[in-house]
Regions:
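Acidic, surface-exposed loops and disordered segments
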Residues: 1-113
Length: 113
């Protein structure tokens, strides 16, 4: 698929099949996300695959109703977090500018696309 076509046809999926997803596909998604650019290549995004029914229910219980409803049939969730105080920060621990941790959140969003 050409990049332009992929960008133009991108959409947010809001309903899922309850069919299991092969671990290889989840790994491929995370590997692709890890290629996204980050501030000074700090690579602060972290990805966690949730696939056991008990953990899925625990995570769903924390979501706002709209999000909970959208993912109630999903057989797995990929949870994305950010290591704080690294991306957007200098080695001495001081933020580079007023955005501070915002750089990590920005990079996390890029990987989630």
């Amino acid at each position: 698929m050409e990049l332009q076509s992929a960008l133009e046809n991108r959409k947010s999926i809001r309903s899922y099949l309850s069919k299991d997803v092969e671990p290889e596909k989840l790994t491929a998604l995370i590997e692709a996300a890890s290629l996204a650019p980050s501030w000074k290549n700090s690579q602060t995004a972290r990805y966690y695959v949730i696939h056991t029914p008990e953990k899925l229910e625990q995570i769903r219980a924390t979501l706002p109703e709209f999000n909970r409803k959208n993912c109630e049939q999903a057989p797995a969730l990929i949870i994305t977090t950010v290591v704080l105080n690294r991306s957007g920060y200098e080695r001495n621990g001081e933020p580079t500018n007023e955005l501070g941790n915002g750089w990590g959140f920005y990079a996390c969003g890029l990987g989630s696309m």
